[in-house]
Each structure stands twice: as C-alpha cells, then as structure tokens.
Amino acid sequence: MPLHELGPLVRRIEDAGYDSVWSAESTDFDGFTPLVVAAEHSERLRLVTGIVNVYTRGPALLAQTAAAMANVSNGRFVLGLGASSNVIVERWNGIPFERPLAKVTETVDYLRAVLAGDRGAGGFKLASPPAEPVPIVLAALRDRMLRLAARIADGAFTNFLPLSNVAQVVHTFDMPGKELACRFFSIPGPEDEALATATRTFVAYATVPVYTEFFRWLGHGDEIEPLVDAWNGGDRKRAVELAPEQLVREIFLLGPVEAQRERLAEFADAGITTAVLALSCPPAELPRLIDGFAVRP
C-alpha cells in the first residue's frame, strides 16, 4: 500500500479499538517511515517497530531516530529491536552477521544511556533526548534471546510460533509483567489457496538459519530437516512439498475471521499478551478485516 494512502487506514485501526500498530522492515519500506505517517493520523495508538535490526544502523543513528519518533508521536513510540538474520544483514547489506546476542546487548545498553540524556561510547550525546524513556522490545526466538529480553528489555516479540509451543516460550521468558508479543500471519480466502500461501511462506522462513534453529529448539527438527535439505540442495519445489501441513496450520491463521479470532484467543489464554496481525490480502480487503478482528467490532 502506498504510504500516502496509509492515514485513513490508521484512523480506522484506532477507531476500532486496537492498541498498537507495528511496522516491519524486510523487502518493503523501512521500519520507521510508516510510523511517522501513523503518528500524524492517530492520537492513542502505540507505534512499534517490529523490528529494526541492530546492524544496519549505527547506535547513534538508532538513538537519533528513536528520539525523533518519540517526539513526533508524543511519547507513543516503542523501539522494537533485534538481530534479524544473516539474509537481511549479511546477504542484503554486506555486514557480517556476527555475535548477535552480544550485539543486541551492547546496542540496548547504549540506547538506554543515550536516550536518557547521557553520553554513549565515543562521546555521542543527544541534543534533544526524549522527555520519557522509550520502551524497548526485543525480537526473540530461542532461549538465550528470550532470557535477554526478560532481563534488559520491556518485552519480547516472537514469530512463527505454533500454539503447542507457546508454553515453552512463556516459561523461558518467565516475565509475567512484561509484554510478550507474537506476529500472526492471517490469510483469508479459500482454504486450499490460503494453505498454499501459508506453506510457501513457512518454507521461505524455515530455511533461514535462525528460523531453522528456532524450529529445532521448539522440537520440530525432524519435521523440517527434509525440507531444509531439499531447499539447500536447490530443489525448492520439493521443499514446499515436504512442508509439514499440521505445523503450518498451527502457526498460520486460516479460514473465516471468526475462526481466526478463536485461534487468537487460544494463544492469549496460553500467555501471548499482544497479537500482531500481518494481514495477507489485497489492500481493498484491509478495512473489512480490520473491522472483523476489531477489539470493539
């Protein structure tokens, strides 16, 4: 969707009772600019990067951008940070994807200091630090990053989580008072088409090393190893054919909106505090789905 058309949609989201809007950063726009538009067309919504990585922007630039976002949103901005993946960091941007846990830790420590008005490493100091602390949420898939998020961040943001594994993530995070968000891909439409789309998306993610390790950690290694081997061997069609259908159905929201809402309620009951919806549909369908998932339909 063109950014100049985003404003009315943001107003609709706010009027429908949603708590926040989250902006991803992958192959489309950067993670911050859509939130600037959202800030201008909302009064209450939290505006969250979900996520920007700690490699492709230096820490001083991240601090400057976070401060600007806090300013333009009147304190509603939440900085979602993460290590991302070797694909985005190294393959697309030419930056070594090294020491992700240490890099995230160092970046958060730096940002906490600089956003509070102190000097960071190298002597950088913000001329206009935010009036209030900027909350930080960390992208976290496996145990070490989940525990790091529990220790140094205001919340954790996970992804591609099967319902049967929510308890494992909640137990590892072990911070009942902090936000535990999860992104959900909602794919409406005929079930066969939706399942095919979900399967292709699953394979594209599951074959990225950080997600391969994530699914192994969750206990699904035996299910995904054949498709990962096929993908790495160059047979992508076979990889899609080998995708475990039951696992795909556990992760993605398929079918009518009411059925998808019921699935989200199950995740909430299991311990997910914030459901971040990624709606896979033509732009013309967005208003209907926004209303369908609304907190106050």
Describe each region flagged by the PLM.
Residues 1-297:
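Active-site-adjacent structural elements that line small-molecule/cofactor binding pockets in enzymes
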